[in-house]
Amino acid sequence: MNCVYIENLTAYFPNINFEEISDSNFFIIDILQNEHKHLKSLRIKPNEKILITNGQGIVAFAMMELIGKTNYKIRINKIIKQFNELPFRLGLAIGIIASKERFEFAIEKCTELGVTDIFPIISDFSQTKNINYERIKSKTIAAITQCKRSCLPQIHQPISTLELIELVTVQGSAYYFDSIILADENGIYPTSNLKNSKNIIAFIGSEGGFSERELNSFPAQTIKWNLGHRRLRAETAAILTIGILSL
């Protein structure tokens, strides 16, 4: 079943009670083709079932009723909130990688695995400090339609490692995470058994890892994970770590 992204989905039914929608109590929305050209590229046919995500916590189970010359008529059969989302907040703090393609690949795959917050970090060894926000957002949109989830991750502005460590350790703040994972060769072997954690953030360094100054700034309760004997690229370490945490 194809999944499509329509950011303004709820604008088509502002006064609908989601709980009352069903196969026998459906409604039709009318979408202009020139506003959603990506639907045409999917070659969806009449009577084909599709999923629609708005990236803001809603997925609609739908069916293509009619493909007109200028519009689509889509039948909405059911709406589910927080579809295919993890039961906890999962952050990825990853050093900005010099290769934009590798950096964007890491973000795309970690989005598929359920990450909710992305923090591009400027570490002492970072070779670049800038990101292309629009390109990264487009990668996350592609990822949530691939894995059929309801929420886009929040992409935060680039921040230094030390500043982010300070933010995520302040209880009560919007940035607070109660568990910090650090990819480190001196750590323990990973486990996904963090049942008491409601918010987990994983720190992955860029090329060269983290400096001694940065490593010494992590709080004592930081959980260090050894990701194996082989030296991994930053994007591989990010995907592996988030994959374990999402299990």
Positions of predicted regions on the chain:
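RNA substrate-binding interface of SAM-dependent RNA methyltransferases
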Residues: 83-179
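A C-terminal functional module that forms or caps the active site or interfaces directly
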Residues: 197-213
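Glycine/charged-rich beta-loop-alpha catalytic/anionic-binding loops adjacent to active sites
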Residues: 28-30, 87-91, 200, 218-227
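N-terminal positively charged helical leader segments and presequences
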Residues: 1-81, 134, 177
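Structured adenosyl-cofactor binding patch, chiefly the S-adenosyl-L-methionine
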Residues: 212-247
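Conserved beta-strand scaffold positions in the cores of enzyme catalytic domains, especially
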Residues: 155, 180-182, 222-226
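Strongly charged, low-complexity linkers/loops
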Residues: 184-196
